Amino acid sequence: MEVCCCSTSSAVPGRRFAAAGAAAAAVAARWGAVGVGRAVVLAHPLRPAPRGGHAHAQQAGARRARRAVVRAVFERFTERAVKAVVLSQREAKGLGEGAVAPRHLLLGLIAEDRSAGGFLSSGINIERAREECRGIGARDLTPGAPSPSGSGLEMDIPFSGSCKRVFEVAVEFSRNMGCSFISPEHLALALFTLDDPTTNSLLRSLGADPSQLASVALTRLQAELAKDCREPAGASSFKVPKKSPAGAGRSAFSKSLNSKKEKGALDQFCLDLTTQASGGFIDPIIGREEEIERVVQIICRRTKNNPILLGEAGVGKTAIAEGLALRIANGDVPIYLVAKRIMSLDVGLLIAGAKERGELESRVTSLIREVREAGDVILFIDEVHNLIGSGTVGKGKGAGLDIGNLLKPPLARGELQCIAATTLDEHRMHFEKDKALARRFQPVLVEEPSQDDAVKILLGLREKYETYHKCKFTLEAINAAVYLSARYIPDRQLPDKAIDLIDEAGSRARMESFNRKKEGQSSILLKSPDEYWQEIRAAQNMHEVVSSNQMKYSPRQENGSAAIKAPSEDMNELTSELQVEEPIVVGTEEIARVASLWSGIPVQQLTADDRKLLVGLDGELRKRVIGQDDAVMAISRAVKRSRVGLNDPDRPIATLLFCGPTGVGKTELTKALAASYFGSESAMLRLDMSEYMERHTVSKLIGSPPGYIGYGETGTLTEAVRRKPFTVVLLDEIEKAHPDIFNILLQIFEDGHLSDSQGRRVSFKNTLIVMTSNIGSTSISKGRRSMGFMTEDTESSSYVAMKSLVMEELKAFFRPELLNRIDEMVVFRPLEKTQMLAILDIILQEVKGRLLALGIGLEVSDAMKDLICEEGYDKSYGARPLRRAVTHLIEDVISEAILFGEYKPGDTILMDIDAGGKLCMSHLNEKVVQLSDPTRTF
């Protein structure tokens, strides 16, 4: 017998006998049948060496080659297995044997197993087994085997032919179980399977049952694999074959081990879509007749009959292959395709586990061969780009054994019929670079269906989803699913996103129905005993009334029994009707809720609270922004249009430009809108345009281009809107930005979308864009003196003059195409002195809130408020000087007093001025403390 190594060695786990080099090499040298790596045992006898002048040299070379090739099967042996083999040689030498027989290998296994239960939990120890073996060895010495010399090592003893067959079967067992190692349990299984007379005699004398020992060994192997979380697929289903004679050779074991024929590549890696369609496991395919006809037309060609479906994810490429399978199952195809089968290839399963060099290519060639031999198979490869360009030998770089190169010849000759499917981007990356591969496929473009076609598709699938979710989808719900998904989920394609919408809506409705039933059952358990007794008495009274009426009005004749029986039958019918659950109805409101959860956009129907909020939105904004009614009305009108659904769906909610003097509330109005309608001020995305003054900073909005630092990272504007599409985007002080930013804004204002540096389209259709600008503030300040702002003109005429001045400045600064895309340009009015008191109340309310967090109250007299307004008013600077006055006259004074310990939690501070006009501060209803009023210029 001879063993050779046909592949490179596998990685050996750390717990194996990594340091058994010398011992393993010596054993291998004496055996002549153990090699390094994955061993394959050859079942032919050694040919006699040729006789001649150079015969000795040939024999020496063969021996050297055999030693080099068979350097150690023991590298696959675990540490325990190598130890058992070495111990078996020691036992053979101790018994005076000239070769290691199977019984000596059994002694080595028994000596290696030092567990408390003995060898394989049988209670057998080495001393007892050695004594029994001595008597057997005296009768069954290996004929012709030389006795070992006294000075030789145990590892110099060779292995008998029977022992080599044990190793051979152990290797087969390991391979069939899917193991990458050989343990003592594998050797024991092989030893018990071989029908060796001396081994059987030894086991009988020890009182052991070989089948029971084999079962224990197999259990230990499975437990060891499960403990390491790496149990291979064949270990759990492995069964020990029946015993065969020791001289039967390798063929007997090959037949017994491979009695169950392995699955072919088609059955292992493919799913028969035609069988699935015949069994009704494929959903009905609605539409796509043109695409399916085009696929059939390509398949019926003589050569290059391989269609490739190209389209975005979710448009229904796989459905076209399933539709063709349905047609074949129904016989609605040309006679050429009646006997064909559509087999869907699982690319992930094909690639998974191909860890050795060339194993993936071997699987692909086997698959191609089986398809060619079958003759009736059309292979469907979904996501074909995962397979093209892969390959362990060529590293996916187009080398000789690249998978694409393996497919080209059979595809060109028509031996392999294939329907491929991939996206347009992946086709450009993998197929267009390889012209030879691309011309073997005929492209079929699969477009996204229209909304009308998507509604038809959902109507065709409605029954399937109603059966699964045990609910009813109304026609309005189907239409809403298509409309809402098309408008508010722009990053996915129809019909996939609409199908997912009704699927999740049905799931949500079913869960809510379950929760309602659970709450009803809980409420029954929470009832008091008195309530139960009241219900019982009411039922008894009703029963008595019904019984008396039956006795009173039922006839006395013989058919009276039938008259009495009729009400009971009616009662049974009523009970059966009550037991039938009412179907769950999924309408537009349920669809809208799910769409809102997906997109973060409130698209459900307006509730009473929503209507109240929208109607009172103007008033809420006026509470925070004083004296800017025009701007408040403009921004509230835009929000109302969007919420009702009357705004243009292809543009942002509104694009507004706020202009005017500084400090009049342009940014504050945007913050107020975010807090009042969008939930909080954090819902606002604020970009300070002073950070984008240089040309190279413009790209930060959409992401850096290739070759620049930051490429691959997300853009500041695009990523924030993509994550949170329903938001307010504030471009603060837009005039400070570089003019190139206006080119980016043109597309957002007009088309409602923008592509980032990664090529992803980001929708701005649900954002409200507000730009603020101080353009014209200098001219306003000058014009107020030169144009008569302080004359006796009315306020309206002054505002009209100021607005005209600002509009001229805007037209001079911005390009006409940008101004023409802005929905509304609002010029804020300058703040009057009479409006400062209302603004002061808002500022003081914020100060009171911060003091309340410290446990201290604050009251400010009217005289003190007048003093603050007097010192904090400047028409050129708006309300910001007023905030500085509050900081100086109130916050600074109170902080000093708190630090000196004059006020503690629970006190209330009263801020006032005395008769001399000086600032004073006191506890409420206590002694007044006068303070000198420090002067400060605002």
Swiss-Prot record:
Pfam families from the entry?
A: AAA, AAA_2, AAA_lid_9, Clp_N, ClpB_D2-small
Q: In which tissues is it expressed?
A: Expressed in stems, culms and leaves.
- Report residue spans for region: I: 266-519
Residues binding ATP, per UniProt: 311-318, 660-667
Give the stretch annotated as transit peptide in the record, renumbered to this chain.
1-83
Chain residue ranges for the region called Repeat 2: 159-224
Q: Where would I find the Clp R domain in this sequence?
A: 84-224
Q: What else is known?
A: Plants overexpressing CLPD1 exhibit improved tolerance to drought and salt stresses.
Name the UniProt record assigns to this protein: Chaperone protein ClpD1, chloroplastic
Species of origin: Oryza sativa subsp. japonica
Its gene name is CLPD1
